[in-house]
Amino acid sequence: VKRQSFILLFLVIVFLPGCKENGSGIGIGTVVVFPEISEPIQITDNDKEHLFASYYGINSFSKNQRYVTVLETELKDGIPTENNPATLGLVDLNTHDFIPLTKTRSWNFQQGCMAHWLATNPDSLIIYNDLRDGKFISVILNVHTRKEIKTIPYPVSGVSPNGKEAVSINFSRLRRTRDSYGYGGGGQDAKLETTFPEDDGMFLLDLETGEAKLLVSIADVKKLVPELPESGLEYFNHTLFSRDGSKIFWLARARPERNTTSLTVNRDGSNLQKCFPDGWGGSHYDWLNGDELMITAEYKGKQYGHILFTVGEKNYKRLGNGLLDFDGHGTFSPNGKWMVTDTYPKNDLREQKIYLMDMKTEAVLPLGRFPQPEEYAKKWRCDIHCRWSPKGDIIGFNSTHIGNRQCYIFKLGTLNDS
């Protein structure tokens, strides 16, 4: 697990000749200064299983970086159902104490309960999903008073940077099409009788009024995705607002083949478009800013990579000079200078690796190797799922390398130009 011989690895990577694809690359003799990075620091106890309470790339940190949102569960193996409530709490990064806040019955091992800190009060208010009275909802909670400020009659799948809007998808349909995602309990009508429903899809939520409007229906994407048999089901997952809140990215997928189409739309519902040509698909993603988007996909339908491009243009660029040609969970630092990504378990050692890339030169620094035990190889797997703190000086991630699921952080030193 410890980062061994990092200085040597750093120099080897930095002084390799660049491939110069699309004008990028690292020239011979280029010097890249990475921040000093701590050893992995475990922030949760081993008595129970823990994971960050949202999907990768979503901020889990309060604005002052004192607290992070974490789920605690006794479930180790198996798909969580409505009968497996998890405890949503905070970890105090000063003491590493776990502070329980509430229970939730809408969660999974991949995306947690989709807890977000709200920019309207980023040190006090979070929103998270739950199942109540047979319905999936979201709850706005003051973490210090434990007072519920508001309940929204829709679950959230992404929250706008301004903290005033969110998007919602059908988590019941998601559970029936990909059971390691979505929630148990039947809190929404999965509409299993319809391949492309016209009244379901991605909704835009007003978190102040609780009102929702259908932004893009599943039927709206029928002509943009591969043809399905009558028994097939198209579904939406993985939504993310751009950094300025003007656009939304998401994936349209299908059963039985799980073909994937990467899509974007403006926040007002205009300019619905595909991100890639046919055959590229899409898997993981993050916005660099309001217009540039990174998606891991099959470049030219041949090679998986971390592909950066401007929405609406075809200026596709594989990041990492060949070192990041895999499907990772890439996410950008708040200042856009760094991208951290990870790998799935590989070879007999089942090692998951974390890499940090300098966006200017595309130099890549390994941060660690984390072996995943065989018992986590199934649908309840533990992906690394990195996430940045608001100041960009902490990276949080999940790992099972000690034999159970726990939360960790790296602390990054500051650079003069950071």
Regions found by a protein language model. Give the residues of each.
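Blade-terminus and WD-like Trp-Asp/Gly-His loop motifs, strongest in beta-propeller folds
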Residues: 58-68, 111-126, 130-131, 157-165, ...
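Short, conserved, GDST-rich strand-edge loop motifs in beta-rich repeat architectures
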Residues: 71-85, 131, 169-200, 251-257, ...
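Asp-box/WD-like beta-propeller blade repeats and closely related beta-sheet repeat scaffolds
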Residues: 106-201, 215-230
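Conserved blade-ending motifs and adjacent loop-strand segments that build the rim/top face
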Residues: 279-281, 320-330, 363-385
